[in-house]
């Protein structure tokens, strides 16, 4: 099949020439596409959401200007930020960033955020499918890594569903609401790549 043809991957159609894909869930219809500079305000609103922010390792009050600059600048090859959009509202985002160090270029880190009212409705799963399809089939990343708060059971279950395995426990990893919290490190290997031992 020519590379420009759409193909079914994990229940979602992916075509490199398409800029977005529509997803319909029982009570939600949204699109997933690459983030653009004009999405900066929506991404900031998502990150500021109380249900989202507590699980992120970021400082409060992200600025739209800083995010717009990030989205406007040339990123490293392979880096991507996808957004889930419902009626103009950014309801979720997933980012994948490769490591720039020579001996770690086979690894990428990712982060996921879904707004409270869209959680447990398939948005996180749809974003994960899109990101994994991109990482496995269009990049040379061998492993995808993440760090998650140790008490974020919903996120951990989602990551395990997509093949991530726990690799370690980081004690007192991050400050959340004035307390130091533990985190887990998890990783997933690209099944299409040969693993050199």
Residue ranges of predicted features:
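Conserved N-terminal entry element of GNAT/NAT acetyltransferase domains
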Residues: 16-38, 184, 190-197
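Positively charged N-terminal leader segments that act as targeting/secretion signals
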Residues: 1-20
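Acetyl-CoA-dependent GNAT
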Residues: 30, 37-38, 56-117, 128-129, ...
